[in-house]
UniProtKB/Swiss-Prot annotation:
This is Iron-regulated surface determinant protein A. Monomer. Interacts with IsdC. Interacts with IsdB. Residues 62-184 form the NEAT domain. It comes from Staphylococcus aureus (strain bovine RF122 / ET3-1). SMART domains: NEAT.
């Protein structure tokens, strides 16, 4: 009787069951990978949409303009200063936002202010909103809707101080140092086009000033001529002396002219050297100016590229690629593990 592991039918059944296991394992791994990648891509898309929404909101927020304004809180029906003035920070602010005006004030000991209402000259209640409520510092920042031209506001408050059993309601009036001014709209940065400086025009070498060459005065040699012998009727001895004197004079004259020519050459040589040195320095200055201007132009061209790169959103797509690679690696390792386990079982069955 043949052993069961040598039976062809048993072997085919084992192969089919092994293929089923491999197929099920591979399918489960692929399905899990797809689910993981889909969830990760949804998170990435949600983060990208949130970033874009924040950028759009920040771009759509209108620029607010403000101006400080002094004020004083006075008792009702008089110009005497009220104690309420000591519980408000000075100065206040006039704010223009979305074409609406607000008077902004900061209340000290905010826990004492149980109620506060503001009215205009026509006894109409003005809308009041809380901008900031700092519990630790016990301060509260409020905005009161106003209009340009308001000079005073009527206030009705309810103050409670538990430490001294103070609980009162009273009316005061808030007097501005000047009427609420009209503020200009804030400049929108998106509509302002940056002015690019024009590069300075360089002069061509032909337009540049030529170096001034110093004028050299030519030195004319002074020749002293000896007086001719007037007396032609002198004796022979005298005539010999006269000829000697003439020859000496001529030789002295030739020596002086040669020395004068040498001095002229010496004077002209340094003048030429100075002129050539000045021309070389001018050429170097022109080349330096050109190189500096080219560097400025390249920097100006690179600055808008850097600004455009700063405005780009972060590249969140790279994280999904990394996750996909890690998932594929994990699936490959799982598949190899299942195959090795299958081979190990087959060896044990044999």
């Amino acid at each position: 009787m043949t052993k069961h592991y040598l039976n062809s039918k048993y072997q085919s059944e084992q192969r089919s069951s092994a293929m089923k296991k491999i197929t099920m394992g591979t399918a489960s791994i692929i399905l899990g990978s797809l689910v993981y990648i889909g969830a990760d891509s949804q998170q990435v898309n949600a983060a990208t949409e949130a970033t874009n929404a924040n950028n759009n909101q920040s771009a759509q927020v209108s620029q607010a303009t403000s101006q400080p304004i002094n004020f004083q809180v006075q008792k009702d029906g008089s110009s005497e200063k009220s104690h309420m003035d000591d519980y408000m920070q000075h100065p206040g602010k006039v704010i223009k936002q979305n074409n609406k005006y607000y008077f902004q004030a900061v209340l000290n000991n905010a826990s004492f202010w149980k109620e506060y209402k503001f009215y205009n000259a026509n006894n109409q209640e003005l809308a009041t909103t809380v901008v900031n409520d700092d519990k630790k510092a016990d301060t509260r920042t409020i905005n009161v809707a106003v209009e340009p031209g308001y000079k005073s506001l009527t206030t009705k408050v309810h103050i409670v101080v538990p430490q001294i059993n103070y609980n009162h309601r009273y009316t005061t009036h808030l007097e501005f140092e000047k009427a609420i001014p009209t503020l200009a709209d804030a400049a929108k940065p998106n509509n302002v086009k940056p002015v690019q400086p024009k590069p300075a025009q360089t002069k061509t070498p032909t337009e540049q000033t030529k170096p001034v060459q110093p004028k050299v005065e030519k030195v004319k040699p002074t020749v002293t001529t000896t007086s001719k012998v007037e007396d032609n009727h002198s004796t022979k001895v005298v005539s010999t002396d006269t000829t000697k004197d003439q020859t000496k004079t001529q030789t002295a004259h030739t020596v002086k002219t040669a020395q004068t020519a040498q001095e002229q050459n010496k004077v002209q040589t340094p003048v030429k050297d100075v002129a050539s040195a000045k021309s070389e320095s001018n050429n170097q200055a022109v080349s330096d100016n050109k190189s500096q201007q080219t560097n400025k132009v390249t920097k100006q061209n690179e600055s808008p590229k850097q600004a455009s790169k700063a405005k780009e959103l972060p590249k969140t797509g790279l994280t999904s690629v990394d996750n996909f690679i890690s998932t594929v690696a994990f699936a490959t390792l799982a598949l190899l593990g299942s195959l090795s386990l299958l081979l190990f079982k087959r060896k044990e069955s044999k």
